[in-house]
Amino acid sequence: MPRLGSRTIERLAIQRMDHIGIVVEDLVAATDFFVQLGLEPQGTGMVEGGWVDRIVGLEGVRAENTMLQTPDGDARVELTKFHAPPAQGGNGHAPVNTLGLRHVTFAVDDLDAVVAGLRARGAELVGKVEQYEDIYRLCYVWGPEGIIVELAERIG
């Protein structure tokens, strides 16, 4: 069993990360943003019925999903628009230190080109482009509806 500091941790048996789910209000705008980044649409569909209600713990779910895949096929992003019950909360541009899942990171070959392309489409950086040691150039970008996307260019 692996150790973390003084703790021994018993591991379960996951195989890999399959996808990350992001709830959005404007499914088209969010899809367009991620497609512009380079993700490939895999399909859009409506989910509803008792089976989905039981999985998510809500009643009367009617939701539209778009699945997007990274070019290497190793990861996917599922964007979901809840038609019923309506989505709750959401703090548009919550700061990066807000508790909970706060960003998703994508590797890029040319950070400057990707940032320039996103800026041309109206996206804004959360902070600045910075270098981490001799390993990465990194930045955070505001996506639609306050989604934070980290871009990472490996340099070393």
Placement of each model-derived feature along the sequence:
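Histidine- and/or cysteine-centered catalytic micro-motif in compact active-site loops
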Residues: 46-47, 82-84
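Active-site/binding-pocket entry motifs
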Residues: 74, 83-86
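Terminus-proximal functional modules
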Residues: 12-17, 21-23
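Non-DNA-binding regulatory cores of transcription-related proteins
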Residues: 90, 94-98
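Vicinal oxygen chelate
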Residues: 2-13, 44-46, 64-67, 75-77, ...
